[in-house]
Regions:
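FIC/Doc superfamily catalytic core
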Residues: 1-251
């Protein structure tokens, strides 16, 4: 039985006792980092912000097996932030799309996350309407015309199903519930909100592709919202990339 098949879905539960110590330790480290950054001058903070965003974009794509040119990513971010870094490198459409999504998520964290905004992010990720060679539904919820949305591995004919997402007909309702919670998650630790948002979004898997990258952008948005700053000085995706095997095992 998958998590979304339980009667109490989507009422997610967790062990407060086990999590509280970990969350407290991470929060302390966050505070120390942000405190140190406050003591630096604007140029150094801006460069750290640029480096963090570049790493976040590159590593989030790497998690999915996609390789982006880091120079293109850095140049695209710098241009959008109005930073003069010299040696501007032209970025392709795929890079521009991922950068656009990440900057919108972290830079406009105070704006409401709704379905249209998610559609815009998804369209930015797939500007050609294709994922690799395969044509996909872009800027709208997936359908089940080719069967249920499944995460599989193995050779053709010997596939192993790791996960099956909720039926496509449930997507409007499932996403509406998620967005309502995300707009008012209550008095929870910001790190817990980011983690729950990520898990919830990849569980419903509303798009034909790109769900992982969008889920991580949502988590980054939750963290930026909690810190009340557009500047990022640590990368969630970089850490996940370092622990990718464990990440997929947990999912």
């Amino acid at each position: 039985m998958y998590i979304w098949e339980h009667d109490n879905w989507p009422a997610l539960r967790w062990d407060d006792e086990k999590l509280s110590r970990v969350l407290a330790r991470v929060s302390r480290e966050q505070g120390r980092l942000l405190g140190k950054m406050e003591g630096l001058g604007f140029p150094l903070r801006s460069e750290a912000h640029l480096q963090t965003l570049t790493e976040d974009v590159v590593k989030s794509s790497e998690i999915e097996g996609a390789k982006l040119d880091s120079a293109q990513v850095r140049s695209s971010i710098a241009r959008r932030l109005g930073m003069d870094v010299g040696g501007v490198v032209a970025a392709d459409r795929e890079v521009e799309g991922v950068v656009e999504m990440m900057l919108d998520a972290t830079g406009n964290y105070a704006q409401t996350l709704d379905a249209e905004r998610l559609f815009g992010w998804h369209a930015a990720l797939f500007p050609t309407g294709r994922s690799g060679m395969r044509k996909i539904i872009v800027g709208d919820w997936r359908d089940d015309k080719e069967g249920p949305m499944r995460v599989v591995s193995g050779a053709i004919g010997k596939e192993r199903v790791h996960y099956e997402a909720p039926p496509a007909k449930r997507m409007p309702d499932e996403v509406e519930k998620f967005l309502a919670w995300f707009s008012a998650p209550g008095d929870l630790d910001p790190l817990l909100i980011a983690g729950l948002a990520h898990l919830w979004f990849v569980t419903i898997h509303p798009f034909e592709d790109g769900n992982g990258r969008i889920a991580r952008a949502i988590a980054d948005m939750a963290l930026a919202r909690a810190e009340q700053t557009q500047q990022r000085f640590y990368s969630l995706s970089a850490q996940i990339r370092r622990e990718r095997d464990e990440y997929y095992t947990v999912l």
